[in-house]
Design a protein with these regions (language model features):
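Multi-pass alpha-helical transmembrane bundle typical of ion/small-solute transporters
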Residues: 1-223
Length: 223
C-alpha cells in the first residue's frame, strides 16, 4: 500500500509539472497575436489566459474521461501505476525537448502516444482500447486539415468584407475582437489541454483502487 501511495503521489506531482510545461508551451499561442498587435499588454494577457483556462478546465470533463478510459483499458493494466508514471514523464521530456529546440508540437499527441507506448511496452497491443484509440488518432490527424480549411475560408471572408474599409478604424475594431478571441482561445485550451492531467490522475486513482472504477469523472480535488 505504501508503494502504491508513493507512485500515485509521484503521478500527481508529474501531472502538475506536465500542466505547467503545457502552459508555457501552448497557452502563449492563445494570447500571442493579441500581445503582438498591442490589443492587450503582456501582463493583462497572461492574467486573462490564466482566468479563462481555469474556467474552461472546470466547465467540461469530456477530455479527461477520454484520457482515462479510451486509450487503454484500466482494468487490464498490470503494473498500471508504473505505466502511467512512465507515460507522463515521457510526455514531459518530449515537450521540453521540442520547446528547447523551438519545434512546434502538440502536448496532446505527446501524452496520448506516451500512454499507448508505455502500455504496449508493459503488456502488449491487447491492452489498447482500439475503438477509442482509433477515434482519437483519426481526430489528431484530421484536426490540422480542418483547421487549415477553416482558416483559409475565414481569411477569404474577412478579406472580402473589409476590402474597402478604413484601415485605422478596421485595426481598432480588430484589436477589440482580438481581446475576445484571446479569451475564447484560452477558455478552449482549458476545456481541452488542462483536462489531460485530470484524466491521467483519475486513471492513476482507478488503477490504484483509490477511486470507484465505475466513475471516470475527475473528483473535485483533481479539478
Amino acid at each position: 500500500m505504501e508503494y502504491v501511495l508513493v507512485i500515485t503521489i509521484a503521478i500527481v506531482a508529474f501531472s502538475l509539472v506536465f500542466d505547467f510545461i503545457n502552459g508555457f508551451h501552448d497557452t502563449a499561442n492563445a494570447i500571442a497575436t493579441a500581445v503582438s498587435t498591442r490589443a492587450l499588454t503582456p501582463r493583462t494577457a497572461i492574467l486573462l489566459a490564466a482566468i479563462m483556462n481555469f474556467i474552461g478546465a472546470l466547465t467540461f470533463t469530456g477530455v479527461a474521461g477520454t484520457i482515462t478510459k479510451d486509450i487503454v483499458d484500466p482494468f487490464k493494466l498490470q503494473n498500471g501505476l508504473v505505466v502511467v508514471l512512465a507515460a507522463i514523464i515521457a510526455a514531459i521530456v518530449w515537450n521540453l525537448v521540442t520547446w528547447l529546440y523551438g519545434i512546434p508540437s502538440s502536448s496532446s499527441h505527446a501524452l496520448i502516444g506516451a500512454i499507448a507506448g508505455a502500455a504496449i511496452a508493459a503488456q502488449g497491443f491487447t491492452v489498447l482500447h482500439y475503438q477509442g484509440f482509433t477515434k482519437i488518432i483519426i481526430v489528431l490527424i484530421i484536426s490540422p486539415i480542418i483547421a487549415f480549411c477553416v482558416g483559409f475560408i475565414m481569411y477569404t471572408i474577412v478579406k472580402i468584407i473589409f476590402k474597402n474599409a478604413n484601415l485605422t478604424r478596421a485595426n481598432r475594431n480588430f484589436r477589440f475582437f482580438q481581446m475576445f478571441t484571446a479569451a475564447l482561445q484560452s477558455f478552449s485550451h482549458g476545456t481541452n489541454d488542462a483536462q489531460k492531467s485530470m484524466g491521467i490522475i483519475t486513471l492513476a486513482l482507478i488503477v490504484a483502487n483509490l477511486q470507484d472504477p465505475s466513475n471516470v469523472e475527475p473528483v473535485l480535488w483533481v479539478k
